């Protein structure tokens, strides 16, 4: 096998692992995510100029699924509509201080139309 084929297989496996982590206990969404991943890989199965970009995209998708997707489950019998979040060990956690200071160092210049 060629190097792109091996790395494409690795990217596909990363997506499968990430979907298992992100959609644990949600079989319907897990199967839909895996079907979509399979469909996307089948659409782009020929090696071409954009193959490395497609592989990189797949790896980024796997990372987002693994580190940034949190599912919520509505608690049964609760009229106030309380939700429980399924936060796993791989979820990226930020603190409020980083949010408060985000973008403060950015200088805004003249508008494009000026």
From Swiss-Prot:
Which locations, inside or outside the cell, does it occupy?
Answer: Mitochondrion matrix
| Transit peptide feature range | 1-18
What cellular component GO annotations does this protein have?
Answer: mitochondrial matrix
What GO molecular-function term can you cite, just one? protein folding chaperone
Q: Does the keyword Transit peptide apply?
A: yes
**Keyword Disulfide bond part of the UniProt annotation:** no
Which branch of life, at top level?
Answer: Eukaryota
Record keywords, A-Z: Chaperone, Mitochondrion, Transit peptide
- One GO biological process from the UniProt record? mitochondrial respiratory chain complex III assembly
Give the quaternary structure. Interacts with RIP1.
Query: Main role?
Result: Assembly factor required for Rieske Fe-S protein RIP1 incorporation into the cytochrome b-c1 (CIII) complex. Functions as a chaperone, binding to this subunit within the mitochondrial matrix and stabilizing it prior to its translocation and insertion into the late CIII dimeric intermediate within the mitochondrial inner membrane. Modulates the mitochondrial matrix zinc pool.
Family, according to the entry, reads as follows: Belongs to the complex I LYR family. MZM1 subfamily.
What PANTHER family does the record tag this protein with?
COMPLEX III ASSEMBLY FACTOR LYRM7 (PTHR46749:SF1)
Q: What is this protein called?
A: Mitochondrial zinc maintenance protein 1, mitochondrial
Species annotation: Aspergillus flavus (strain ATCC 200026 / FGSC A1120 / IAM 13836 / NRRL 3357 / JCM 12722 / SRRC 167)
**Name of the coding gene:** MZM1
